[in-house]
């Protein structure tokens, strides 16, 4: 991929779109990566936040024995063969009785590569709100409740933060509307837009094996990588080409993600914005030195791409990636 190709790839990722994953630049040491399979070695969860014009939140009352009678947002596990959006729509229909469409991803939460939750802001498009007369094993009922007075008892208090995240986004969008892109991937991995900036310039880390490309790091399933979360895979790749003890690395968040749960391909690629900076910057006009020949710093000269990158960095205009 020449400079023109890199510019096109960066523009695609900044626009929330996806690129096919054909190989990865960094893998965990030891055993080869196993194919990712729902219900076997990964669990993906979907959750939806609905807010209406009366500042009310759609809540469902749980039917499961361990949390029966408590209240939560519509949520549940993805099933094999589903897209992420299809899973969210199915859970909302089963638990609340409503048809819906996603507005944007609000956040992505992870506990390592084996457990990832996708939080959507969504809007109803039809259906009939579930009442206690229609109680079943999915939920007892659903209802709209004032955002400042959610029904109790709550199944878990993380919903309070998620509702507020949705309300803030409705008041003022903190990132572009971003939805999962339907592209297959056979592993859980991250495509890095790893940046180094000075007052006037922006550099992006590029992998050189094969055609120059935005580097991809595979997430492992070892106990260490699970404990450390998916940021371990980012640090592993950067450690392979940079002297990290003199650098500060920050994961800003997601520019997008891609998944297509067809033909037993359950992997996910997260497109992640990362900053690399010197711990003691002083006057630094050049990015940190690269070790080896598998990577280089690409100086972004396209004015529009420069502006987009700087805006996304300065405003943290990304989907939060939390642990």
From Swiss-Prot:
Keywords: Hydrolase, Magnesium, Manganese, Metal-binding, Nucleotide metabolism
Sample GO molecular function, one term: metal ion binding
Cofactor: Mn(2+); Mg(2+)
UniProt-listed Enzyme Commission number(s): 3.6.1.58
InterPro entries on file: Nudix_hydrolase, NUDIX_hydrolase-like_dom_sf, NUDIX_hydrolase_CS, NUDIX_hydrolase_dom, NUDT18_NUDIX
Chain ranges of the Nudix hydrolase domain: 37-167
Residue sites binding Mg(2+) per the record: 58
Gene3D superfamilies xref list: Nucleoside Triphosphate Pyrophosphohydrolase
Motif (Nudix box): 76-97
Swiss-Prot/TrEMBL GO biological process terms: dADP catabolic process; dGDP catabolic process; GDP catabolic process
SUPFAM superfamilies in alphabetical order: Nudix
Reaction(s) this enzyme catalyzes, per UniProt: 8-oxo-dGDP + H2O = 8-oxo-dGMP + phosphate + H(+); 8-oxo-dADP + H2O = 8-oxo-dAMP + phosphate + H(+); 2-oxo-dADP + H2O = 2-oxo-dAMP + phosphate + H(+); 8-oxo-GDP + H2O = 8-oxo-GMP + phosphate + H(+)
Purpose of the protein: Mediates the hydrolysis of oxidized nucleoside diphosphate derivatives. Hydrolyzes 8-oxo-7,8-dihydroguanine (8-oxo-Gua)-containing deoxyribo- and ribonucleoside diphosphates to the monophosphates. Hydrolyzes 8-oxo-dGDP and 8-oxo-GDP with the same efficiencies. Also hydrolyzes 8-OH-dADP and 2-OH-dADP. Exhibited no or minimal hydrolysis activity against 8-oxo-dGTP, 8-oxo-GTP, dGTP, GTP, dGDP and GDP. Probably removes oxidized guanine nucleotides from both the DNA and RNA precursor pools.
Family membership: Belongs to the Nudix hydrolase family.
Matches recorded under PANTHER family: 8-OXO-DGDP PHOSPHATASE NUDT18, MUTT/NUDIX HYDROLASE
Protein name in UniProt: 8-oxo-dGDP phosphatase NUDT18
């Amino acid at each position: 991929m020449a400079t023109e190709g890199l510019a096109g790839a960066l523009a695609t990722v900044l626009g929330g779109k996806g690129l096919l994953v054909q190989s990865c630049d960094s893998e965990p040491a030891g055993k080869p990566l196993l194919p990712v399979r729902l219900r076997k070695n990964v669990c993906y969860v979907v959750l939806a936040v609905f807010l209406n014009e009366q500042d009310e939140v759609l809540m469902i009352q749980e039917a499961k024995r361990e949390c029966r009678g408590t209240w939560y947002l519509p949520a549940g596990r993805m099933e094999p063969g589903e897209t992420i959006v299809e899973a969210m729509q199915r859970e909302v229909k089963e638990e609340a009785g409503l048809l819906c469409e996603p507005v944007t991803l609000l956040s992505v939460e992870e506990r390592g590569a084996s457990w990832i939750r996708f939080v959507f802001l969504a809007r109803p498009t039809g259906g009939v709100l579930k009442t206690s007369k229609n109680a079943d094993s999915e939920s007892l009922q659903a209802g709209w409740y004032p955002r400042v007075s959610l029904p109790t008892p709550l199944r878990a208090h993380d919903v309070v933060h998620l509702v507020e995240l949705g309300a803030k986004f409705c008041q003022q969008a903190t990132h572009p509307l971003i939805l999962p892109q339907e592209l297959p991937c056979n592993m859980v991995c991250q495509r890095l837009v790893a940046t180094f900036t000075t007052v006037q310039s922006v550099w992006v880390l590029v992998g050189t094996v094969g055609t120059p490309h935005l580097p991809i790091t595979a997430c492992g399933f070892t106990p260490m990588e699970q404990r450390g979360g998916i940021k371990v895979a980012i640090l592993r790749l950067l450690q392979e080409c940079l002297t990290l003890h003199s650098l500060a690395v920050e994961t800003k968040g997601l520019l997008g993600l891609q998944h297509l749960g067809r033909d037993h391909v359950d992997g996910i690629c997260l497109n992640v914005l990362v900053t690399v900076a010197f711990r003691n910057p002083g006057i630094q006009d050049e990015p940190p030195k690269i070790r080896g020949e598998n990577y280089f710093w690409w100086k972004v000269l396209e004015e529009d791409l420069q502006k987009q990158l700087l805006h996304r960095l300065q405003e943290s205009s990304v989907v939060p990636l939390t642990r």
